Curated annotation (Swiss-Prot):
Catalysed reaction, written as an equation: O-phospho-L-seryl-[protein] + H2O = L-seryl-[protein] + phosphate; O-phospho-L-threonyl-[protein] + H2O = L-threonyl-[protein] + phosphate
Keywords per UniProt: Cytoplasm, Hydrolase, Manganese, Metal-binding, Nucleus, Protein phosphatase
Purpose: Dephosphorylating regulator for many key proteins. Dephosphorylates sakA, to negatively regulate the stress-activated p38MAPK cascade.
Protein name per UniProt: Protein phosphatase 2C homolog 2
Phylogenetic classification of the source organism: Eukaryota, Fungi, Dikarya, Ascomycota, Pezizomycotina
């Protein structure tokens, strides 16, 4: 079952990719994406001169829009170009170029008269990939996950308002977090656009209530690194990072094209109708980037297939590799990885499935290694907000009931209105 989807693929000597984007049950598509295999290619006489493969940089990005699609579309068309124009990029400092490029994208939108009254915004999860290194920049709650012999290694972390570090910046800038949202409105704390939260002239762009300033992760590629997945929260709200990696790995073992694996994952996540209340109804965009590491496409597929056949790393069950099979759906997540996993070996690589604390995300679980889960996904403040609202409403209702009991005639006259007010409060809570 597909709802207004589009897919594409490509490859060069360094990597191959497949992507798919689906509108889902939303009335409009607000996601955008970018896939550029040669970021430094020079245009001469109407044709492009390719960069030497040993020096080539590829760029991939997912931009999940909210409040409209204009900022997301601008980001999809321009972020990679803006990053490539940064002074740091020319000097080979890709990490700084990504940070500067995100902020420069905000400035470019502000300076464009077409966007003078624009209120929309978007997340940005992007990756620059060389022959032996990956840079991941993230602002918002789209996510980048590396598949390492079937194990999910997060290369980005969601920016949520209830995270202690994010909440501290929001408060210092004059904002607040209510029900897990910035000023009771925005469900993420970093984004491109959203200029209504960036109006403090005395503060730097990094200090605003909402900032486009990204976190950047740098990863040295090893032979165990098989692929990178970049996707918006339409995927991650339905599946854990580990389940996505296992699903992708099974599709590769079954020799499916990468864009087809993306399509199957989206069909798997898509709710059967629009009545589920959000999960499985969102726009979805997903990119899988295969890390060739000196291999041909065929050799890369064969290597992963052999690893799966030999039980080298976790993988989804064989039936998940069948083209007609759509996987577990949003109500049935994959189980944890096998108990014979070599924990010490994984620690030596800088991540660990077992050592991470289990964070509940939607209907699945997410393992966030080497991070403080209270800082990243602390729901306690949000829960306190909800509790305080409920206690306040209950106190009001108790006071109203006491007053009405003193005046029976008044109680009879106002009983209908009190019921309506209570219903509205319950709905809003």
């Amino acid at each position: 079952m597909r709802t207004c989807g589009t897919s594409s693929e490509g490859q060069d000597e360094c990597c191959l990719y497949g992507l798919s984007a689906m509108q889902g049950w939303r009335i409009s598509m607000e996601d955008a994406h970018a896939a550029v295999l040669d970021l430094q290619a020079k245009s001469t006489g109407g044709s492009e001169k390719p960069t030497d493969p040993d020096k080539r940089l590829a760029f991939f990005g997912v931009y999940d829009g909210h409040g409209g699609d204009k900022v997301a579309l601008f980001a999809g068309e321009n972020v990679h170009k803006i990053v490539a124009k940064q002074e740091a990029f020319a000097k080979g400092d890709i990490e700084q170029a990504l940070k500067d490029g995100f902020l420069a994208t905000d400035r470019a939108i502000l300076e464009d008269p077409k966007y003078e009254e624009e209120v929309s915004g978007c997340t940005a999860a992007v990756s620059v990939i060389s022959k032996n290194k990956i840079w991941v920049a993230n602002a918002g709650d789209s996510r980048s996950v590396l598949g390492v012999k079937g194990r999910a290694k997060p290369l980005s972390f969601d920016h949520k308002p209830q995270n202690e570090g994010e909440k501290a910046r929001i408060s210092a800038a004059g904002g607040f977090v209510d029900f897990g949202r910035v000023n009771g409105n925005l469900a993420l704390s970093r984004a491109i656009g959203d200029f209504e939260f960036k109006k403090s002239p005395e503060l730097s762009p990094e200090q605003q209530i909402v900032t486009a300033y990204p976190d950047v992760t740098v990863h040295e590629v090893t032979d165990d690194d098989e692929f990178l997945v970049i996707a918006c929260d339409g995927i991650w709200d339905c599946q854990s990072s580990q389940s996505v990696v296992e699903f992708v790995r099974r599709g590769i073992a079954a020799k499916q094209e990468l864009y087809r694996i993306c399509e199957n994952m989206m069909d798997n996540c898509l709710a059967s109708n629009s009545e589920t209340g959000g999960v499985g109804c969102d726009n979805m965009t997903m990119i899988i980037i295969g890390l060739l590491n000196g291999k041909t496409k065929e050799e890369w597929y064969n290597q992963i297939s052999e690893r799966v056949a030999n039980g080298d790393g976790p993988c989804a069950p064989p039936e998940y590799g069948k083209s007609e099979f759509r996987g577990p759906g949003i109500r049935n997540q994959f189980e944890e990885t096998p108990d014979n996993y070599d924990l010490e070996n994984d620690r030596s690589r800088g991540f660990s499935v077992r050592s991470g604390r289990i964070i509940l995300l939607g209907d699945g679980t997410e393992l966030i290694p080497e991070q403080n889960d209270e800082e990243l996904f602390d729901q306690r403040e949000e829960n306190r907000d909800v509790t305080n609202h409920l206690q306040h409403d209950k106190a009001e209702e108790t006071s109203t009931a006491a007053n009405l009991s003193e005046s029976p005639s008044s109680a009879n006259k106002n009983s209908s209105g009190s019921g309506t007010e209570a219903t509205e409060k319950s709905a809003s809570s």
